[in-house]
């Protein structure tokens, strides 16, 4: 799978352009992407019109931020006249990149100014990001007590956890909590010789609350290997293949030390010799088989406290997992404290299987499952799976922009809508998007598509070059 580059689009109508004096600048409103404010800067100087992309350092972040992007700036008029320039730049100490002389000021006035306004669009694709602000991982202190049944102590720090959930993912912890260890049955157990920070991150990743990054992947992977938590090892490997900015040589070293064969194959394909690549292929299948479905049938009874019946199939699950992510299910459990079995009507059992897998953190959403998971997540008020579906659709899905726009409209997903529109730039993709029932489109979506269509109908393309 290709690396998950982030793509977004900034667009702004600059008004009262004639009032912008020499050596003056005006800016579009800040728009937040990845915790960083972005904006378009328009500058008038020496009869030249400068256009710049600004990536400001967040005010609450002391880290050294680096963002490498390719970007395309488009100046367009309502008649379809268009002028485009593209570049690749690194934002860090320098927070603004662009062109002092994007176009001659008088040319802009004659060709692009309509009602004293101009339209500027900037399409941005990130190549690498580092040092950006990160949300804090989920707390496992007393505030998580409602959704816990035990405490794990690491370096004098208490983590309130759900024992059956951890046992579900980790055979070692299953034996520790429920096996022949002396700690079995105790409300509090202590883990020695590990980092409390790494354990915190490991829990957060298991609970699907925290993103792995280049700063924490080493500690998480070492601990996941030590405790043998397969799903976290898999997620670390996937990140190192798809999202890491670490040099290939370092990733290859990690692959060797942790026996991550898929990562090793990926790294050798990028930096290895012909003999090394051939050797890697010899020990690895050319196609990774589709993962087996995680079973929530009676074999999972030991790690469950409630049953859901869907299309005559029984799913043995934990109340706390469902309740912690869904106000709908939390209400059901509160109103039916002693009830052990519930029936869900009019939903597909395969969709429910996929949804539960996402909730348990054992499934990666794909193009085959995303719509079913999204439908149930919306139906049962589950923000977390919805967020995961949107992230997949924006970053990794191979669905067409037209399909994504349809999904965005059905579930009112504005971020997905904006990302899909940013991908629609070629004539064929515009035609495909406009081929659906335009009466069902949001006005702003239709307007954006028509503007893009006007550009491609124009015979006056002064300059076009793009990395996209």
Swiss-Prot record:
SMART domains: BTB (SM00225), MATH (SM00061). PROSITE patterns: BTB, MATH. Keywords: Repeat. Signal peptide: none annotated. Gene3D superfamilies: Apoptosis, Tumor Necrosis Factor Receptor Associated Protein 2, Chain A, Potassium Channel Kv1.1, Chain A. The keyword Ion transport does not apply. Residues 148-215, 304-368 form the BTB domain. Residues 7-124 form the MATH domain. PANTHER family: BTB AND MATH DOMAIN CONTAINING-RELATED, MEPRIN/TRAF-LIKE MATH FAMILY-C.ELEGANS. This is BTB and MATH domain-containing protein 45.
């Amino acid at each position: 799978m290709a690396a998950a580059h982030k793509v977004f689009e900034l667009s702004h109508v600059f008004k009262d352009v004639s009032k912008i004096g020499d050596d003056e600048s005006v800016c579009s409103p800040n728009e937040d992407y990845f915790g960083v404010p972005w904006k378009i800067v328009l500058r008038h100087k020496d009869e030249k019109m400068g256009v710049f992309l600004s990536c400001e350092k967040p005010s609450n972040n002391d880290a050294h931020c680096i963002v490498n992007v390719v970007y395309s700036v488009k100046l367009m008029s309502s008649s379809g006249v268009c002028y485009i320039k593209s570049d690749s730049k690194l934002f860090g100490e320098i927070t603004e990149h662009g062109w002092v002389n994007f176009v001659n000021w008088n040319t802009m006035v004659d060709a692009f100014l309509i009602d004293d306004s101009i339209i500027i669009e900037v399409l941005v694709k990130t190549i690498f990001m580092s040092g950006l602000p990160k949300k804090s991982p989920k707390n496992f202190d007393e505030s998580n007590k409602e959704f816990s049944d035990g405490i794990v102590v690491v370096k004098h720090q208490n983590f309130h956890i759900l024992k059956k959930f951890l046992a579900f993912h980790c055979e070692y912890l299953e034996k520790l909590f429920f096996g022949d260890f002396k700690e079995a049955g105790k409300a509090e157990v202590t883990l020695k010789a590990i980092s409390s920070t790494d354990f915190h991150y490991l829990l957060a990743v298991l609970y699907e609350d925290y993103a792995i990054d280049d700063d924490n992947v080493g500690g998480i992977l070492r601990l996941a290997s030590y405790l043998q938590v397969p799903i976290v090892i898999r997620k670390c490997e996937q990140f190192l293949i798809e999202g890491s900015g670490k040099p290939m040589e370092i990733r290859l070293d990690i692959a060797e030390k942790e026996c991550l064969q898929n990562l090793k194959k990926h790294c050798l394909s990028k930096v290895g010799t012909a003999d090394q690549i051939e050797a890697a292929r010899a020990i690895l299948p050319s196609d990774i088989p589709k993962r087996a479905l995680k079973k929530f049938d009676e074999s999972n009874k030991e790690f469950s406290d409630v049953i859901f019946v869907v299309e005559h199939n029984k799913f043995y699950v934990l109340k706390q997992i469902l309740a912690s992510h869904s106000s709908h299910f939390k209400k059901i459990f509160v109103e039916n404290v002693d009830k052990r079995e519930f029936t869900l009507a009019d939903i597909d059992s395969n969709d429910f299987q996929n949804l539960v897998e996402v909730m348990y953190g054992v499934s990666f959403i794909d193009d085959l499952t995303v719509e079913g998971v999204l439908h149930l997540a919306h139906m049962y008020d589950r923000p977390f799976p919805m967020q995961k579906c949107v992230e997949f659709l924006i970053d990794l899905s191979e669905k067409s922009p037209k399909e994504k726009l349809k999904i965005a409209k059905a579930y009112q997903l504005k971020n997905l809508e904006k990302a899909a529109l940013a991908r629609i730039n070629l004539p064929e993709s515009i035609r495909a998007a406009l081929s659906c029932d335009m009466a069902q489109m949001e006005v702003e979506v239709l307007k954006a598509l028509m503007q893009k269509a006007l550009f491609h109908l124009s015979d006056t393309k002064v300059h076009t070059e793009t990395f996209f």
